[in-house]
């Protein structure tokens, strides 16, 4: 700021030589009210001072930058991410205090592409958002459990079985889609 911006009609019976401020530059550390002293000096060296309250505001939202991410489900069918994994260099003119995601935990119901929103908040409460595509993958193979089976042949000498008859409690971290046999008759 300049003394001219703070001056509210200073005068002298002769003439004013200089007007100076004890602080002219402000940073994020100065957000809020600041007392600034203006010193007015006339051509004869006489000095007078006054104070003014300068309120510094940070109204600039952080710039949120997201990156896409892939998450693998574990053996229990769960996966999670953190905001720092989604963050791709978000920045602010002051200081970022929090990164938050609207969804961090994923299950088998989320397999595929999911849109996640990250909110970046700065020290003065300003926010910025971005979205990321989080691709959830289930790469855990099912556990196939089989049981022995005795098949009685019919009068024509044929017999058949189903996968359900051979299954002995097979499982998967998500769910079993299909069970097949390589030979059924």
Where are these predicted regions, by residue range?
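Proline-threonine-serine-rich low-complexity tracts
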Residues: 1-185
């Amino acid at each position: 700021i300049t003394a001219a911006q703070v001056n509210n009609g200073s005068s002298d019976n002769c003439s004013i030589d200089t007007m100076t401020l004890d602080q002219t530059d402000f940073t994020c550390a100065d957000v809020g009210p600041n007392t600034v002293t203006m010193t007015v000096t006339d051509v004869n060296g006489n000095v007078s001072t006054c104070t003014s309250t300068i309120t510094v505001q940070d109204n600039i939202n952080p710039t949120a930058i997201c990156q896409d991410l892939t998450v693998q489900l574990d053996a229990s069918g769960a996966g999670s991410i953190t905001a720092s994994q989604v963050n791709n260099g978000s920045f602010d003119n002051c200081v970022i205090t929090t990164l938050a995601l609207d969804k961090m935990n994923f299950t088998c119901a989320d397999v595929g592409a999911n849109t996640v929103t990250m909110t970046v908040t700065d020290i003065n409460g300003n926010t910025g958002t971005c979205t990321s595509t989080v691709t959830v993958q289930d790469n855990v193979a099912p556990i196939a459990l089989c049981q022995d089976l005795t098949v009685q042949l019919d009068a024509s000498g044929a017999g058949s079985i189903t996968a359900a008859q051979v299954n002995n409690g097979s499982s998967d971290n998500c769910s079993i889609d299909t069970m097949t046999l390589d030979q059924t008759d």
